[in-house]
Design a protein with these regions (language model features):
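Iron-sulfur cluster-binding electron-transfer modules in prokaryotic oxidoreductases
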Residues: 1-160
């Protein structure tokens, strides 16, 4: 494959559409049909999805797409009503923005992140920056939704 810049000049609609992972998977589910019903199930309760703020605003159905995918595999997923994690790309890494970054995290994500280790294993976060921010302020790295799906399908128990 070629880099998108090599095949598209930006002046017209490109001959391709880049999709988010969950967009692609949600569209592929009907093709999988009954084959997903026989897969192993995770029984530890519903998983908590903390969505990447930019992704949620650019693709407003992204959280519901994840929920649809997880349900197809017999897993319950609860998208959390949160705002920005406070990382905001490089902004949150800059020393002069630490207090503001922490404040944004505490106003939203910090109030919803569970305190005990068992509940934290159910926390999923889409964005790399979001997972970094949770590690920074809550002391653990949440799994990406695809990691949780893989773990459930393989019968693995996530590490504490």
């Amino acid at each position: 494959g070629q880099d998108a810049h090599a095949v598209h000049d930006g002046k017209a609609t490109p001959p391709f559409r880049i999709q988010l992972l969950q967009e692609y998977l949600a569209k592929k589910l009907p093709e999988l049909g009954a084959s997903v019903s026989a897969l192993p199930r995770e029984t530890a309760g519903s998983l908590l999805l903390f969505g990447h703020c930019t992704e949620r605003t650019e693709e407003v159905t992204s959280q519901e797409q994840w929920r649809t995918i997880f349900r197809a595999f017999g897993l319950e997923l609860e998208p959390q009503a949160t705002g920005c994690c406070g990382m905001c790309g490089v902004y949150g890494h800059e020393a002069e923005h630490y207090d503001e970054s922490r404040g944004v995290f505490d106003m939203s994500w910090g109030k919803r992140i569970p305190g005990d280790a068992a509940a934290r294993r159910r926390v999923l976060a889409q964005g790399h920056s979001c997972r970094s921010q949770v590690k920074r302020f809550s002391g653990f790295v949440p799994r990406h939704p695809m990691e949780a799906l893989r773990d459930a399908l393989e019968g693995a128990t996530p590490a504490e």
